[in-house]
């Protein structure tokens, strides 16, 4: 199994690469790419960690050597948020980066499963889909927006509030991956109940958690370490499913049946070909139903922005 990380010299990319080097199954290959000249050195640094995962780093304009034979590609390349910016402010720079990298994926490893981490995810996933479609290689069961950070944050905040162990909590999060489009389904956590005020406060905290980190880092970046952990969790789940493990479920932002929006984050059963089954979002509470209906316009605008970026 070969996993490629694009944007591997950045804060998220380095954290992700470290976790993959230590946790990928024995015999896996890990390929690191970034435009920055330090990237082969990051690979050498990680190569000294004693795990049976082969690692190689590539830098420069051309990502193709890193992509050859990849089964899974995780894209974290792009610029980070600074205080006062929202995820959509990143669009102007990151849209072009994602478009370029996905074109190279379409040419080099068109059958790979692709996880997009680069923000704004609501839009960059639509860009990736349109690029793959133009190249005639789009498989909607193999393209994912990685929203796992919203899930792990939800698990952490709920566990803190309720005095539970975080490993016992798993909160499904649906919708998109920014602001109001992030919708944690707090009504679906077995054995945990909340007051209306707790639901309103927790939902808001989960939606604004990225900004909490951006402000706390005081201009020094955005969430890189927790995002690295989230991306590693998603990437490792994908690898396990591709290798035949049964019952692997993760939420991610994918093209579904279009009931709510063309792309929508929902629970997915993963399998040997990527998505095996898009699972139901289940029964929503009145609060969740209202929040979902209220976000769809924002989400659809984000998606259209990505589609138009490729068609223009």
UniProtKB/Swiss-Prot annotation:
It catalyses: (S)-malate + NAD(+) = oxaloacetate + NADH + H(+). InterPro entries: L-lactate/malate_DH, Lactate/malate_DH_C, Lactate/malate_DH_N, Lactate_DH/Glyco_Ohase_4_C, Malate_DH_AS, Malate_DH_type1, Malate_DH_type1_bac, NAD(P)-bd_dom_sf. It holds the Pfam family Ldh_1_N. Substrate binds at residues 81, 87, 119, 153. One of its GO terms (molecular function) is L-malate dehydrogenase (NAD+) activity. GO terms for cellular component: cytoplasm. It is an enzyme of class 1 (oxidoreductase). PANTHER family: MALATE AND LACTATE DEHYDROGENASE, MALATE DEHYDROGENASE, MITOCHONDRIAL. Keywords: NAD, Oxidoreductase, Tricarboxylic acid cycle. PROSITE patterns: MDH (PS00068). NAD(+) binds at residues 7-13, 34, 94, 117-119, 227. Catalyzes the reversible oxidation of malate to oxaloacetate. The active site is at residue 177. Belongs to the LDH/MDH superfamily. MDH type 1 family. Its EC number is 1.1.1.37. Homodimer. One of its GO terms (biological process) is tricarboxylic acid cycle. The lineage of its organism: Bacteria, Pseudomonadati, Pseudomonadota, Gammaproteobacteria, Enterobacterales. This is Malate dehydrogenase.
